[in-house]
Amino acid sequence: MRITTSIPGYKQIEIKLNPARKIGDLKKVACRKLGIEPDLTRLLLNGKRLREDLAVSKLKSSTAPVTLDYLWARQLLVWGSEGQRKLRTVTVLLAGAGAIGNEVSKNLAMLGVGRILIADLDQVEMSNVSRMIFFRSKDLGKNKAEVLAENIHGKYPYVETSAYRGELESMPLKLYLDSRVVVCGLDNVVSRIFLTQICRRYQIPLIDAGILGLTGRVQSYIPPDDTCPICLFPRNQYSNIVGLRNPCEARPDEPAVPSFSTSISLVSSIQAQETIKVIHGIDEYRATKQWPEKTGQPLRETLFLDLKNNRYAQMKVERNPKCIVCGKEGTARDTATRGELPLEMLYRKEPNKTIRRAANLYEKIITTYLENSHGTTKMEGYPTIRKRVRRGDYLRILSEARNGELHEAIIKLV
């Protein structure tokens, strides 16, 4: 029996199936052919839901196509099932669970991002409740990251969430390396400097944003060549700069800043869309220096918004050669080589040569570290490495060139 199935406006396919098979089997076959998830899809006939326990033969008398009512059917019209698959299989790190973090995580979850890791040290306070959609009065005193992760997953169960309640500097490096994009929703310069260092050194795209009252800014940073978010700051004023803050509650020794839900929503929406652009196009960009036409390229300049005076402008900021992060003497002036290695290769002969080839290193290896979800462990010889590593872990390798320069490489075990 041949059955026509359709995602309206996107694609229509014909499926041949034994009439004795169940409607549920039809759904599985159709979803597999279209590259969408069966558990997020319903089958409709003339607008009414089909029972999946019925036989396919029940459709013989109908000439209308069976509609696949997929959760993200409207998004397929723009980027197709392959584009949606990229979102469903990606991890995004959200640094900061305040006002921006609430809105960005909501948007990413609604778009179908598969996993969101949320990091924040702070607790929910009363002034947060009026501006942050996932915080309620009963959450007062609880950790922001944990509350946001729990409530996002509760509302959008198809999104995996996890929380890290601690300082960014203490977070295992693996959690950064696992992230396709880092979204910055931080309220202090010191943490933003650290985050930018990590993103530049390990070439992780960073979408940074800030708000002050009815003004805001958004910057997309594609390392290593872009102007980094810290290039704006004069080197001799780092200790005094607060800049455009993300409106989490101010520390006791800092003045509170004005915050409005309208500017929060606007800036966060732009930040989320920039994240989607990077997820869809970063591989193509790194290979061809072109961004996909369907989703567009991220901001190449810093976007400034002024809702009070209705002003919106992009400003090009040149790289600062004296930048504390990416400058000639910056803390992240050198970037690490990144590669992948099948885990089985470590159990073959000459693992040292195998690792060198994977890391594109031909110098003397000084130290090898294991980076996993528990943190960093120094490895003493290859027998130790073989016993300790798991698929998905990383090896961080430091090597020394003949001229004395140190090189760093990151190898993911797949």
Residue ranges and their predicted role:
Residues K11-Q12, R49, N403-E408:
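Short, solvent-exposed loop/turn motifs
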Residues R21-K22, K28, K33-L34, V66-V414:
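Adenine nucleotide-associated cytosolic modules
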Residues M1-K16:
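Eukaryote-biased recognition of intrinsically disordered, low-complexity regulatory segments
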Residues P19, K28-R49:
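Short loop-to-beta-strand transition segments
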Residues Y10, I36-P38, S61, G404:
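A cross-taxa feature marking solvent-exposed loop/turn segments within ectodomains of secreted
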Residues G47-D69, I385-R388:
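Eukaryotic mixed-charge, acidic/polar low-complexity intrinsically disordered regions
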